[in-house]
Amino acid sequence: MAKGIKEMKKDLEQAMFEDLGRCHFWTELAEYHGLLDFISYHSDMLDDYTKEIHTDPALLWIPSTSKVRYEPLGVALIMGSWNFPYFVTLKPLAMAILTGNCAIIKPSELGPCCAKVIQIIVEKYLDKRCFRVIQG
């Protein structure tokens, strides 16, 4: 997904300008770099998120062992907002991807150009069996 965001930077900025009148500088600062930094940081932390955690068992169960294993829960529904359409929509999508979940993405209908760019990124760069965008 980060690759798609980088490749579609100009489209992201143009759609934001058409929908909200937001200048390219602010879009790049608040949405583009913030999102890429978020994805980069959490991608680096993936091993910490997925490793088993061994804990001390309850007194009743000694000498057994206890551990916590994190597993995907299923499908996430991500509802986007109109004021920060990329960050608020693609940030939870990145976390769904990193945690192994599928997602249904519903961008805001108040920003149709941004919603279309989100749909292009999802359809072009992510697995169509796991991630769907619903417009409207």
Question: Which residues does each predicted region cover?
Answer:
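Rossmann-like NAD(P) dinucleotide-binding subdomain of oxidoreductase/dehydrogenase enzymes
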Residues: 56-136
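N-terminal Rossmann-like NAD(P)+-binding subdomain of aldehyde/semialdehyde dehydrogenases
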Residues: 1-64
